[in-house]
Amino acid sequence: SNLSTVWVIAVVILFQPELRRILIYLGQNPFVRYLFRVKNLAMVGEITESVLICQERKWGMLIVMEGEVGLKHIKEKSASINAQVSAELLVSIFNPTSPLHDGAVIISHEVIDAAKCILPLSEEPQGARMKLGTRHLAALGLSEETDAHIFVVSEETGTLSHVHNGVMKRGIDEIQLRKVLNNLIV
């Protein structure tokens, strides 16, 4: 067992340039890229479906798509999920009777990483922001500190908002949602 581990490490070290070229080739191969694209398109569909269901039912929803800035400090204080993204799971998490429905869901590296995440509130609730609910203020707060894309469904109106870099776009529709998700994921 120890000898085989040494051999694997030796092969990786000796053939590092060749292995790197193979990985680059695979990354540029249209078939391999197509396989990843199909998987990612499915994830876009799952997220979109869950948003539409929660909008229809007027269930509050807060989905964070983690960017380059890590959210480890938030995930540590939340419920770890580590599950494949599915509409059924997202809808069940945001069901008002679910113990996980309060807080945000963080999607990271194509998995639902955590739920019941408490996000920082925006520190400047002035003007129009004074009329926002806690979910929207939390989305703004996180977007002011990180590069995450956050999607919020209002439980009062069923309206979908997209928040990024401290800017909130309210009333986005299914087409706009798919476009943003495609740019993020695919």
Give the ranges of each region predicted by the language model.
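Membrane-water interface of transmembrane alpha-helices in multipass transporters/channels
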Residues: 1-6
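Divalent-cation
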Residues: 10, 15-18, 22, 26-186
